[in-house]
Amino acid sequence: MKKLMGIALAVAVLAYAINLLFDAGVFYRVQDINLQQCQKIPGISGAEDIAPLKEGGALISSLNRHDNAPGALYYFQQGQAPLRLPGDYPAEFYPHGIDVWQKGTETWVYAVSHGSRGDRIETFRFERAAMRLVYQPELSRSVGKNINDISVIDKSRWLLTRDHAFSGMLGRVEDYLRLPLSLVLLVDDAGEHTLLDGLHFANGIYYNPQRGRLYVAETTNGTVSSWAWRPGEASPVLLGRFTGLHGVDNIMPDGDGLLVAAHPQLLKLAAFQKDAQARSPSLVWQLSLGTQGAVERSQIYYQSHGQALAAISVAAPLGGRILMGSVFDDGLLTCGEQ
């Protein structure tokens, strides 16, 4: 009996390990797709996230994660070099996910920043005519730890992803065991509230206020979940989970659908983080939505072994093309018909 139990346990552990390796993309075959229509844009490091502007151009979160220097926000317009925006940045500014809120002629920029005392949302007003940022301390605030991305509802209400419950070694254990301990937080004038829990490495987030639809990328199980929710409602209603997307990262709207950047081989992403010569593959999905707003279909827009830009973490429509950035690599990639 003990022998049978031991065999059953060994089989269960082996099956779990194989499933874990599958989710990490170890068995995923990378094929180069749509490389010929892409152009590399130098002049920026660690462009983890992109926020397109309604009047054209985009703001970009930039941080060289291979040194300890603070980061910055950049402005980019098709056909021009990335411009580092001057402004009164906080002393500790290490940006990750960003979003913008625009009303009339004014634009506010919200950036997740990882500081020595925890994470903050640092808020700026973007003065387009002067091409500069003005820090808004009254709209900035501490938000705990392990915050990854932000989707802005309005000037003082935001949705945040908390990708891990723990940091350091315990955070790695959380990943290896695929523990569903990740959250989506609603931040408003009353404080921080848990909107969703039980998620696997909640990463990118996008909220469509017109349709009342919320989308969350769960990295370690390669899923984008779709939810119906509007401010004032108690809990989001799950519309569906679309699986098989491999290491999903940031989510961006693209017409009637979504663009989702992904890391198809997560172990290579971890290696690239430590060694810039160990290129990490890149993948961008185009997702189609059904009549209820849930993700229903997917197709690959771009895929590579990381030759031009490794570890692509975001893809956003801009000026009739698709602009891509990477969390760990240098430069941008712009793709599409000229």
Kindly give the residue locations of the regions a language model identified:
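Beta-strand-rich domains and repeat architectures in extracellular enzymes and scaffolds
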Residues: 39-71, 309-314, 327-330
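Short, conserved, GDST-rich strand-edge loop motifs in beta-rich repeat architectures
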Residues: 60-70, 112, 160-179, 260-281
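Loop/turn-rich, solvent-exposed surfaces of beta-rich toroidal or solenoidal domains
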Residues: 208, 245-302
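Beta-rich, blade/repeat-based domains predominating
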Residues: 44-54, 88-104, 141-158, 164-166, ...
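Beta-propeller domains
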Residues: 26-30, 55-87
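A short helix->beta-strand "capping" segment at the edge of beta-propeller domains
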Residues: 24-45, 80, 84, 133, ...
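Blade-loop segments of beta-propeller domains
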Residues: 71-114, 250
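Blade/loop signatures of beta-propeller domains
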Residues: 12-36, 71-76, 177-182, 283-294
